[in-house]
């Protein structure tokens, strides 16, 4: 492709609202243009990258046995009402009416649509299993669209859905799709980790996220420094501490702590280590009027997903009201503890072996020092209540945990019968008995993959595309293409030979200054660059550089095509 026939629109500066490197570079490189908050046009250069990602995805979906179809963006409300998600999904679901006053929505996912198709088309175990996928535009009415296409309202996703006669079949397909995702992200040249994850609003049981490692990632993942264990930090379990409890050394003493309502202010006021403090979280119990007290170390982060699964705790997790707290404890938040509390108490594993804690005294403006479980209050039930921290023992018993930030680009779920039961997606088994199908779903954020790749592959000059994702594999930058016959002839010859060799080449024949052409080639991140100028041609050479290291080399003009094609095929 010649640049004069293509469309290149680059900027020297990124818009002020762009925070992430990917957002800045995608705007500057002209990959996307903003139309409204969270809405973008994919320009020709960006669309080429998007199609490269889609091609890899399609190839690996076919290899995994998934069949492509295309479902609508606009979906009828009755399907969502049938599954129960019409109200549950909330304001992120963009609802609309047609001219006949019928309700529809812009689909953020397609579980309901595919379930409806399958229940109408498949009725026998002989037709199972089946695995379908599509690549389609989605819409979620985000409250605060931000970070460019990383969290846009409109985006492109690959969704796959599988249907099965039994769980064993679902597990087989789940494993195959998991492997396919690993191949996809490996082929795209991304550094990633598959991690055990929570199922969230999609529902179901087994779940894995595929996280591209990047400092700008919103998610935190925990992984073993020894084994292959990895999980989202919200799901990684902590283990009970080993050994005996530290012997109590101090007496229980009530101390006056005026205006001390946070762990930070408590540590400062008493001049104690934060690890010696306990914080109290009060949540509603399953039964009306009941509350449950949760205790964890002051320096640890409370995990509401784990807490919600505890026996006797209301689901969804609901914090107790200030009035209920005062009624039960006689004090306000910031001064609470287990002494004298008769209700259910859970304490985190990390507190079980400790002694002489500092805890709220259930009187405003007072705390206890020297608090010990079993002596000053009944032994609580010790459970996992917190997020893991770096250095914790790996849940598989192998090594210690490390933490890294990641960007979720894919997610696979074992939905089981969450949707098939609600929508009566059934089949006749080999005994002629009606059974509910097992279901899996598997998503990849195609547009998000592009942004995540840039977050992982950029420098001060611009994007550094991986081999599989580059808009073009090679850019030819001729100096004075319009004015120098020698340069133009050499550029056209190399361009034709590279095209004949099957390379994806951009010949930048724009009538621009050399600095503009060179800067744009670096900003656009094309992996291989050939610069052609009169001076080098007089010596029989062209200048060649790979974008990742930017080390320019003089290569004989007769050898450049072989050199580049060898690199492309490596």
Curated annotation (Swiss-Prot):
GO molecular function: aminoacyl-tRNA deacylase activity; ATP binding; proline-tRNA ligase activity
Matching InterPro entries: aa-tRNA-synt_IIb, aa-tRNA-synth_II, aa-tRNA-synth_II/BPL/LPL, Anticodon-bd, Anticodon-bd_dom_sf, Pro-tRNA-ligase_IIa, Pro-tRNA-synth_IIa_bac-type, Pro-tRNA-Synthase_IIa_type1
Class of this enzyme: ligase
Enzyme nomenclature, EC number: 6.1.1.15
Domain free text: Consists of three domains: the N-terminal catalytic domain, the editing domain and the C-terminal anticodon-binding domain.
Record-linked HAMAP family: Pro_tRNA_synth_type1 (MF_01569)
The family this protein is said to belong to: Belongs to the class-II aminoacyl-tRNA synthetase family. ProS type 1 subfamily.
Gene: proS
Its job: Catalyzes the attachment of proline to tRNA(Pro) in a two-step reaction: proline is first activated by ATP to form Pro-AMP and then transferred to the acceptor end of tRNA(Pro). As ProRS can inadvertently accommodate and process non-cognate amino acids such as alanine and cysteine, to avoid such errors it has two additional distinct editing activities against alanine. One activity is designated as 'pretransfer' editing and involves the tRNA(Pro)-independent hydrolysis of activated Ala-AMP.
Origin superkingdom: Bacteria
Subunit structure and binding partners: Homodimer.
GO CC annotations on file: cytosol
Gene Ontology BP terms: prolyl-tRNA aminoacylation
Cellular localization per UniProt: Cytoplasm
Chief location bin: cytoplasm
Catalytic activity entry: tRNA(Pro) + L-proline + ATP = L-prolyl-tRNA(Pro) + AMP + diphosphate
Protein name: Proline--tRNA ligase
UniProt entry keywords in alphabetical sequence: Aminoacyl-tRNA synthetase, ATP-binding, Cytoplasm, Ligase, Nucleotide-binding, Protein biosynthesis
């Amino acid at each position: 492709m010649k640049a004069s026939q293509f469309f290149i629109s680059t900027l020297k500066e990124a818009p002020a609202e762009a925070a992430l490197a990917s957002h800045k570079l995608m705007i500057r490189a002209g990959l996307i243009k903003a139309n409204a908050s969270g809405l973008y046009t994919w320009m020709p250069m960006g669309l080429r990258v998007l199609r490269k990602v889609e091609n890899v995805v399609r190839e690996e979906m076919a290899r995994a046995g998934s069949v492509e179809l295309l479902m609508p963006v606009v979906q009828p409300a009755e399907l969502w009402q049938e599954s129960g998600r019409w109200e549950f999904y909330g304001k992120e679901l963009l609802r609309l009416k047609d001219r006949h006053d019928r309700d529809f929505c812009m689909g953020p996912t397609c579980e309901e649509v595919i379930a409806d198709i399958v229940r109408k088309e498949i009725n026998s175990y002989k037709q199972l299993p089946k695995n379908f996928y599509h690549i389609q535009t989605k819409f979620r009415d985000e409250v605060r669209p931000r970070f460019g296409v990383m969290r846009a309202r409109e985006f492109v996703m690959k969704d796959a859905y599988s249907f099965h006669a039994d769980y064993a079949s679902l597990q087989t397909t789940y494993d195959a799709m998991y492997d396919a995702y690993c191949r996809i992200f490996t082929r795209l040249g991304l550094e990633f980790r598959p991690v055990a994850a929570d199922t969230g609003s999609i529902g179901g049981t087994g779940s894995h996220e595929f996280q591209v490692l990047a400092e700008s990632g919103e998610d935190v993942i925990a992984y073993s420094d020894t084994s292959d264990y990895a999980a989202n930090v919200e799901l990684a379990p902590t283990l009970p501490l080993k050994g005996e409890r530290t012997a109590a050394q101090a007496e229980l003493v009530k101390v006056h702590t005026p205006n001390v309502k946070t762990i930070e202010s408590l540590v400062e006021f008493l001049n104690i280590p934060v690890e010696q403090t306990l914080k109290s979280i009060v949540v509603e119990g399953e039964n009306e009027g009941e509350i449950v007290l949760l205790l964890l170390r002051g320096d640890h982060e409370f995990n509401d997903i784990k807490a919600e699964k505890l026996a006797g705790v209301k689901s969804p997790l609901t914090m107790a009201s200030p009035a209920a707290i005062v009624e039960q404890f006689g004090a306000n938040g910031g001064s609470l503890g287990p002494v004298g509390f008769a209700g259910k108490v859970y304490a985190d594993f990390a507190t079980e072996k400790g002694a002489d804690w500092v805890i709220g005294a259930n009187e405003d403006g007072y705390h206890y020092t020297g608090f010990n479980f079993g002596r000053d209050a009944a032994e609580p039930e010790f459970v996992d209540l917190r997020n893991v921290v770096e250095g914790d023992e790996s849940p598989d018993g192998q090594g210690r945990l490390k933490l890294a930030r990641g960007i979720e680009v894919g997610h696979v779920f074992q939905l089981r019968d969450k949707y098939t039961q609600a929508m009566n997606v059934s089949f006749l088994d080999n005994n002629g008995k009606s059974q509910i199908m097992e279901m899996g779903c598997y998503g990849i954020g195609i547009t998000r993959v592009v942004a995540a790749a840039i977050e992982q592959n950029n420098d001060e000059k611009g994007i550094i595309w991986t081999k599989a994702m580059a808009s073009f594999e090679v850019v030819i930058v001729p100096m004075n293409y319009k004015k120098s016959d020698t340069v133009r002839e050499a550029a056209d010859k190399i361009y034709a030979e590279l095209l004949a060799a099957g390379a994806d080449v951009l010949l930048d024949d724009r009538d621009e200054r050399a600095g503009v052409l060179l800067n744009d080639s670096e900003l656009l991140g094309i992996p291989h660059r050939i610069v052609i100028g009169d001076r080098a041609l007089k010596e029989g050479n062209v200048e060649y550089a790979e974008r990742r290291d930017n080390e320019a080399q003089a290569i004989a003009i007769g050898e450049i095509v072989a050199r580049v094609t060898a690199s492309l095929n490596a």
